[in-house]
Amino acid sequence: MNIKYITSGLLAAMIVNCTAFLTSCADDLEVGKNIDESAYSGIYENNAYLRDGKSNLVSKVVELHGETYATTVKMGLSKTPNTATSAKVKIDAAYLETYNKAHNTDFELYPQDLVTFANEGVLTVNANAKSAEVDMTIRAGEGLQDDKTYAIPVAISDQSSDITIKDESAKHCIYLVKDMRNAGDTYKGEDAVKGYLFFEVNDVNPLNTLSFQLENGKLIWDVIVLFAANINYDSEAGRPRVQCNPNVQYLLDNNETFLQPLRRRGVKVLLGLLGNHDITGLAQLSDQGAKDFAREIAQYCKAYNLDGVNYDDEYSNYPDLNNPSLTTPSTAAAARLCYESKLAMPDKLVTVFAYGQMYGVATVDGVDASEWIDIVVPNYGSSAYPIGNMTKKQCAGIAGGGSSLTPSTARSLMNNGYGWYMGFAPSPDNYYSIFRRLDGAETLYGSPLKDPTVFYKKNDPTPYQYPDDL
């Protein structure tokens, strides 16, 4: 190897490269040219956002079971301030029009004189913190209507000069308030574990919810699902649609007889949705398809005065990917449907059965799953798990059909922070065994489950004596 020639070659190459580098720098650098700083905008800003302090949600549904409801409003910052900084929160009545327009809702403003903020709404974020909270109290009033949703838009105001508010969404959080004082037969305490029940309505009357009563008069099932309507393809319209079989449609058409008596006692009634052996499916809608289908679900809930929906991804065929309403089956598509459903009906429950592709994606468009999934229930013999910022309070810890609500199971639910237990397809013909499997109710609620005395036959609102009239 000739070291002399290699060294000479390297030196020549370095001279050429340095010349090229200096020429490039000279070409790029223009002294006195204004620099576009847009790429750096925001990096020094301290952006604020508003949340409900208890739930950390932007949109919080509040049910008034007593004369007052207490929570906190939290202002968070994107970074720790150099010195203490402050802002105020207040009711922004004008924002409600914007909110209603965005969600196609018609919520009325909650009476402002029934809402108070501690410390005149002032929040102070200390130099070693990134958030602050202020107490908020919502009082009940005599003029409130039952079964109506009111809105309280809360906004940041009078912020210090070092606080930036990026947009209207960051500036606001909203409380959707329902007066439940006259519909409290399911209310067993704010932190009580709740019951979630599927009714096979092809065979069983949902009024049988009323058979399950504690000795203290409370009903154990807080939410029931009409199982199930279907998602099907409408060939004339060229899009997915809701399809109700005659049994489901009968209950919807006669909801004042079979559903509203439950709702007036505090039971939430949901429409169950299930695939039905064609090209559509709950986890295979395109973004636009999900938005359109969610709007139809919202229309059903409004027309028949229902409390929300349960989605179950089963029994769908592979989609036609040439159809603009459909896409490849995925958990992302299922999450999009849940997200769009919550946008279309923010005061209703959006719940999922964690099966197939229905559950698993934690964010849609940067919005956490805790904002658009209210409850997740598991398959038989398993427990649901939270995703994103969800907690076990939004999850069922057991699923009927594979598990019983025994005293030890009830203690496990409470000790592990689960918010729900799930039951499936009760029939009066099986009440003896069903009630024996619910003896953990006393552990949960401090009151034993009464033996059944009444039941309801299909499509008949008459209470019959159990077991004599079976």
Can you annotate each of these PLM segments?
Residues L11-T19:
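Hydrophobic helical h-region of N-terminal Sec-dependent signal peptides
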Residues A26-S86, I91-L114, A118, T124-T137, ...:
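Secreted glycan hydrolases and related glycan-binding modules that recognize and/or cleave
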Residues M1-L11:
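Bacterial N-terminal signal peptides that target proteins for export
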Residues A20-S24:
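C-terminal motif of bacterial Sec signal peptides marking the signal peptidase cleavage site
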